């Protein structure tokens, strides 16, 4: 496992990215999914036109699915809408999207685009170049790249959670929860098929299984901005995530 402790955008200045799949899980995101899809399609059209966009509607009770279908009807990029009903959880949504990916590399990104799309080459190119099997964005390696911080309580809870994850799993990473992770699918498909956590701790499970399988993992600092409307409850979901991590450790 390796970590890049600096932000050097000059390293990622290729004119065009190789084809990859983008997976966006969403639950009741009608207020912003339209803008997110349009921005993603525009980015792919300009930087990787052979790529595909997969939106996973995880049992939304609002117009999320209808909005996605409407935009996809005129898309120039290959698109797919997967529907999970009832809601199964973010982990299940991400897994179903990644396992449906048809490109050699797949990236999942949160629906709020807290990590700007312009950071995409940082996680795609190390995989395309054969350096790693998993590359993921991190807020923990260079906090100066955080533009808009989370509320203080939420940010501290996240830092404590990541410390407990390090202690419980021996994972050497400083931010397992940033929603910006890319996978070399031929290497990662077995761990995705083996994963069982459907909740918010799914990231930890994927990294844990990948490390145990000997895959090459790289944590990379990315720009990040907090967006309002998070579905994560600071207390209840943090406790649920800790229970999932403890169960993961005991099962291993």
Outline where the language-model segments fall:
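Hydrophobic helical membrane-anchoring modules
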Residues: 9-19, 163, 170, 194-252
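Short, well-formed alpha-helical segments that are part of the catalytic scaffolds
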Residues: 29-44
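Donor nucleotide-sugar binding loop of glycosyltransferases
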Residues: 29-32, 60, 90, 116
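Acidic donor-diphosphate engagement hotspot in glycosyltransferases and nucleotidyltransferases
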Residues: 36, 64, 94, 118-120, ...
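Conserved donor nucleotide-binding strand/loop of the catalytic core
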Residues: 50-54, 65-100
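A conserved acidic beta->alpha catalytic loop
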Residues: 57-66, 113
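Acceptor/aglycone-binding surface of glycosyltransferases and processive sugar-polymer synthases
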Residues: 84-100, 105, 117-200, 226-236, ...
């Amino acid at each position: 496992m390796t970590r890049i402790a600096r932000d050097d955008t000059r390293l990622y200045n290729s004119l065009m990215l190789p084809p990859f799949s983008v997976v966006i899980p969403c639950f009741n995101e009608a207020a912003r999914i339209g803008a997110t899809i349009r921005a993603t399609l525009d980015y792919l059209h300009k930087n990787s036109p052979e790529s595909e966009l997969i939106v996973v509607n995880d049992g939304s009770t609002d117009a999320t699915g209808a909005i996605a279908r409407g935009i996809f009807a005129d898309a120039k990029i290959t698109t797919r809408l997967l529907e999970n009903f009832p809601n199964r959880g973010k982990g299940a949504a991400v897994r179903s999207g990644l396992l449906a990916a048809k490109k050699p590399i797949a990236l999942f990104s949160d629906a709020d685009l807290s990590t700007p799309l312009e950071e995409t080459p940082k996680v795609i190119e190390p995989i395309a170049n054969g350096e790693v099997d998993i590359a993921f964005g991190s807020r923990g390696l260079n906090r100066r790249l955080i533009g808009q911080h989370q509320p203080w309580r939420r940010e501290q809870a996240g830092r404590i959670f990541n410390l407990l994850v390090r202690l419980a799993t021996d994972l050497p990473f400083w931010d397992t929860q940033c929603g910006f992770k890319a996978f070399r699918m031929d290497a990662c498909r077995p761990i995705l098929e083996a994963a069982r956590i459907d909740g918010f701790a799914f990231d930890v499970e994927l990294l844990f299984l990948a490390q145990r399988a000997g895959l090459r993992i790289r944590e990379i600092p990315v720009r990040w901005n907090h967006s309002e409307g998070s579905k994560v409850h600071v207390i209840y979901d943090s406790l649920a995530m800790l229970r999932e991590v403890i169960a993961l450790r005991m099962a291993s």
